[in-house]
């Protein structure tokens, strides 16, 4: 099974996982939607400046776990989370935590590009404005430009930043959403199948961007594409029926997994 390119294998091997500190720690995380239990005592830690891919069949709990990391599940009626998740030393589910501030520190990029019905500039400047990150118009201009550069979009839109963001192509809209996320200086970026609505060329640009973003951010990505998980991540976690099956270095997961369920899923025997 040769799911990893040679470059990806080298990338994974060169990344010294054992020496990388944890950015987020999940301990005994369970999620309930009303009476239905969706996650069962998941213990999963996210390493700093690392791309962690969450894989598994539809309905396995990977997106549910992802949304726990910045409490997006709070927006779902009847959802209840137990266990503990920490961001550095901060308890994500502490009753006194500022959830708005948490979601600035742990940003989110969704499956379908969802730019605001505003200009490109306003899409990126909105977060810094409400969080008071810019002291002047010049500061705000610089944040917008830097964020668009980090999202690999600046050169494509620098002459039309005051045009609507909804007029961009799908791939450009998704990179605009990434720029919007990084504009508030997050520590972690969550991505829920960010390429599922994109064509192969746009997908390749987003994957290249993920590699670049890892230098400054911790990234957790949910993906149904085994090839994508192999290409972009250093760590991979396999979910099945609400349970964490295993988590390991990506090269090991795709060449010599510990659990036969992981092997069967990667080989396409179920999904």
Swiss-Prot record:
Membrane topology classification: Peripheral membrane protein
Reactions catalysed, as given in the entry: phosphate(out) + ATP + H2O = ADP + 2 phosphate(in) + H(+)
Annotated EC: 7.3.2.1
Database matches in CDD domains: ABC_PstB_phosphate_transporter
One Pfam family cited in the UniProt record for this chain: ABC_tran
Coiled-coil region list: none
Residues holding ATP: 56-63
UniProt xrefs under InterPro entries: AAA+_ATPase, ABC_transporter-like_ATP-bd, ABC_transporter-like_CS, P-loop_NTPase, PstB-like
Localisation per UniProt entry: Cell inner membrane
Keywords: ATP-binding, Cell inner membrane, Cell membrane, Membrane, Nucleotide-binding, Phosphate transport, Translocase, Transport
Domain ABC transporter stretches: 24-266
Broad class of enzyme this protein falls into: translocase
Molecular-function GO term, any one: ATP binding
Keyword Nucleus: no
Entry annotated with the keyword ATP-binding: yes
GO CC terms: plasma membrane
SMART domains: AAA (SM00382)
GO biological process, one term: phosphate ion transmembrane transport
Self-association and partners: The complex is composed of two ATP-binding proteins (PstB), two transmembrane proteins (PstC and PstA) and a solute-binding protein (PstS).
Family named by the database record: Belongs to the ABC transporter superfamily. Phosphate importer (TC 3.A.1.7) family.
Reported function: Part of the ABC transporter complex PstSACB involved in phosphate import. Responsible for energy coupling to the transport system.
Protein name from the UniProt record: Phosphate import ATP-binding protein PstB 1
Species of provenance: Rhizobium johnstonii (strain DSM 114642 / LMG 32736 / 3841) (Rhizobium leguminosarum bv. viciae)
């Amino acid at each position: 099974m040769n799911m990893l390119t040679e470059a990806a294998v080298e990338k994974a091997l060169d990344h010294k996982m054992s020496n990388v500190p944890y950015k987020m720690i999940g301990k005994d995380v369970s999620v309930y939607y009303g009476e239905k239990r969706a996650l069962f005592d998941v213990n999963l830690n996210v390493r700093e400046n690392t791309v962690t891919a969450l894989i598994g069949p539809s309905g396995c709990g990977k997106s549910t776990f992802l949304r726990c990391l910045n409490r997006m599940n709070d927006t779902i009626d009847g959802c209840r989370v137990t266990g503990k998740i920490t961001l550095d030393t901060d308890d994500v589910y502490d009753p006194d935590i500022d959830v708005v501030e948490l979601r600035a520190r742990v940003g989110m990029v969704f499956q379908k590009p969802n730019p605001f019905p505003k200009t490109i500039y306003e899409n990126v400047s909105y977060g810094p404005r409400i969080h008071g990150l810019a002291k002047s118009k010049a500061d705000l201009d610089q944040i917008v430009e830097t964020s668009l550069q980090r999202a690999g979009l600046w050169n494509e839109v620098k002459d039309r930043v005051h045009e609507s963001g909804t007029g961009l192509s799908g791939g450009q809209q998704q990179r605009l959403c990434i720029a919007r996320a990084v504009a508030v200086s997050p520590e972690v970026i969550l991505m829920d199948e960010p390429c599922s609505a994109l064509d192969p060329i746009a997908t390749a640009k987003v994957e290249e961007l993920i590699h670049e973003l890892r230098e400054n951010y911790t990234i957790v990505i949910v993906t149904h594409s085994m090839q994508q998980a192999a290409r972009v991540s250093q760590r991979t976690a396999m979910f099945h029926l609400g349970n964490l099956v295993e988590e390991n270095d990506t090269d090991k997961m795709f060449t010599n997994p510990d659990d036969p369920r992981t092997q069967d899923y990667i080989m396409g025997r179920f999904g």
